[in-house]
């Protein structure tokens, strides 16, 4: 997607789903065996599959009544059996927990998992950079801050909190990669873009918020039963093309409507970024080989979803305004498809059209929500305007590696 041409097929990001298939590393089942096969094996003698321990556990439950009526020795014997059964059902990594009660970790992770976490670290670094620019403005009283507070009085602290969360994500992911003896990510060589001329903090940036093409199709998507993964497309709730989401001149030179339009643009941009992160994390989680990587990806995803829901609600509070120079924010409640109080994800098509509609994140396919799709989408919004060719090569190299990651159990291996 290029410039302001934004269709749902290239808007690659958005919301949260429980993964039904577990990764198959040391902590998971090897191969492609399904649950029915496992249950069948559980009843066979001598099976060493983890599911076979369920058979032993069922045997122990039959002893509960009699064991507690046969005195102390019987109870001790029963408790020993119960402990052994529990240990058998427990993932091996938990049995290796240190004496301080801390849960252990594997010595390392697969290269595919590392590629996934590296791209997510890069995405978080970029997110942190853009959120920091918003924080720099709202931490100072100004007409822009007042316009954001006109949307919701808590906008400044919400922005600060979101910024802090992104810092925590980037720092954790890179620290974890180092802990796993994997290469971390640094984009500092590309911190070359200028701040807004009127930013309270003048420092080189990675992202550009001064010429934004803000996708607002998510506002319709989550209020519809359609799903991009099934080919459904959506228009724009508001047409925001080549507009700043932060002030770019002395704020006294803006009219009241103009500064409100800039604040409204920011509000929709907040949600656009976070719905995208939600879809990205969900899509890449399905490629994780280890339970450890899966835990990290889905846990951070939950934070992204929480962010999106806040900003989805706040964007709906953006007042109708005409900037006077071509940007119009309509009264969204005049359109049944954009009712502002419909903030919960409407049930939509999911997995198969012959199944009931389900409230989920969408899209979640690699084609529409994977790393390359996410990088392509962000580039189309103007977020990287002014960046070097080397930046784009580095970003898309990381993205391609993440998308190529394969759950190792899908090929009969393990991490």
Which residue ranges define each predicted feature?
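All-alpha RGS (Regulator of G-protein Signaling) helical domain and cognate RGS-like helical scaffolds
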Residues: 39-43, 49-73, 83-84, 98-415
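N-terminal export signals
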Residues: 77-98
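Compositionally biased, low-complexity segments
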Residues: 5-8, 29
